[in-house]
Amino acid sequence: VYKRQSDYLYPDPDNMVIFLDNHDMSRCFYQLNHDFEYWKMAHAFLLTTRGIPQVYYGTEILMSDSTNPGDHGTLRADFIGGWDTDKLNAFEGKITGKRKEAQEYLKNLLNWRKNCKPIHEGKLRHFPPTFEDEIYVICRFIEDRLVLLVMNNDEDKKSVKPADYINQIKPSKNNHLGFDVIEKNEININEIIQIPSKSFLLMDLYY
């Protein structure tokens, strides 16, 4: 969170490459102790915050270096489905369980991001965690559209009113509806929303 306070050192922080892992460090899923909920939250942040996201191959099917942590050969293992001897084929989506869910999750998130102007052209404002709420919030916004990401890393669920953050950037209307990017439903930003432990809300809002 506080790394952003050094953004002034760079001519254009929005054009810096950001990543969760790469070929020289343990894979994200392993770093997160194979916690799928943390993995989803981490990628929601990566694909929403400022910068150009880099997603290492195999991330979308939860590849891990747990068998030999940090080993370069393990970090750069073949993507499953590229060889006749592979029992699964992620190239054709012939995978199951969490791997399939992760692939669909990332596909949905990336397709949404592709045409989301606030992510590509907008400003960023964040609300660092406090001892009272223990949640982290970022907003990406342009004149007529805003993206809100609320992350709850606490052990307890949190109650959040999206308008409390949105109105600090631009006043909203009564009964203003935002779109939940993950659940694909509408949310009244003036209502209290429960965010479970180790979970997040990603909302897309038009003015």
Predicted regions and their residues:
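Short, small-residue-biased leader/transition segments that mark boundaries at the very start
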Residues: 1-2
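Short, flexible beta-strand-to-coil junctions
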Residues: 141-143, 182, 206-207
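Loop/helix patches that line or flank the sugar-binding groove of alpha-linked glycan CAZymes
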Residues: 10-170, 195-196
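C-terminal beta-strand-rich structural cap/linker in extracellular carbohydrate-active enzymes
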Residues: 187-207
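Solvent-exposed beta-hairpin/edge-strand motifs
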Residues: 165-184
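Active-site neighborhood of glycoside hydrolase catalytic domains
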Residues: 5-7
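Extended, compositionally biased low-complexity polar/Lys-Gly-rich tracts
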Residues: 103-107, 181-187
